[in-house]
Design a protein with these regions (language model features):
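Solvent-exposed loop/turn and edge beta-strand elements of beta-rich ligand-binding domains
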Residues: 1-185
Length: 185
């Protein structure tokens, strides 16, 4: 089925034997359990200030499964980098706490597995969350990402956001008779 890895193991099941032209009743001596493995992947990103590209630390990003609504937070490290991969920070360390850049992340049921991706097959919404370290900037718009391949790391690249525009105040005088901005001499 879509979203699962193909089981390439051949499972042999003894269904009965033929004796004198007739088959004996079906008996299964050892039940066979065939487990389907859900495709899993990861994502990574770099967060930087627009114009200067200064790396931004401790910026939270919420990742939400569009299929289940399950949601967890990852934070950028001191170099502005973040990843859901166990190679970055094991899934099994402070799983889904979302309090530091070193907390692991895992979506779905079951025990976190550091040999697999954190995100099961599907579409995810990625949102930058407001915090002290990005309060002077406009948050990037939320965007979707799709996990479709086993163990693929989706590189979101460097995400930047603009500073809030600085309000400007000014005056402009117009000549009442001519309507121009030039005064009479």
């Amino acid at each position: 089925p879509e979203g699962y890895l193909v089981d390439t193991v051949t499972h042999c099941i003894r269904t009965g034997t033929e004796q004198n032209g007739s088959y004996k009743a079906l008996k299964i001596w050892n039940p066979v359990e065939i487990k389907e493995k859900l495709i899993r992947g990861d994502l990574k990103l770099v967060k930087a200030a627009d114009k200067t590209l200064k790396r931004l630390a401790d910026i939270p990003f919420r990742i939400t499964s569009q299929a289940t609504g399950e949601s967890h937070v990852i934070l950028t490290d001191k170099n502005g980098e973040a990843s859901t991969g166990a190679y970055w920070h094991p899934h099994t360390v402070n799983t889904n706490k979302g309090e530091t850049s070193e907390d692991g992340i895992w979506f779905g049921e079951g025990t976190p597995d550091n040999t697999r991706g954190a995100l099961p097959y599907g579409t995810y919404l990625v949102e930058e969350l407001s915090c002290k370290n990005n309060e002077d900037r406009m948050l990037i718009p939320a965007f979707e990402v799709e996990v479709t391949k086993e163990m693929r790391i989706i590189d979101l690249g460097t995400l930047t956001n603009d500073e809030h525009p600085v309000p400007e105040i000014g005056t402009r005088a117009s000549d009442r008779e001519t309507g121009t901005h030039n005064g009479k001499r």
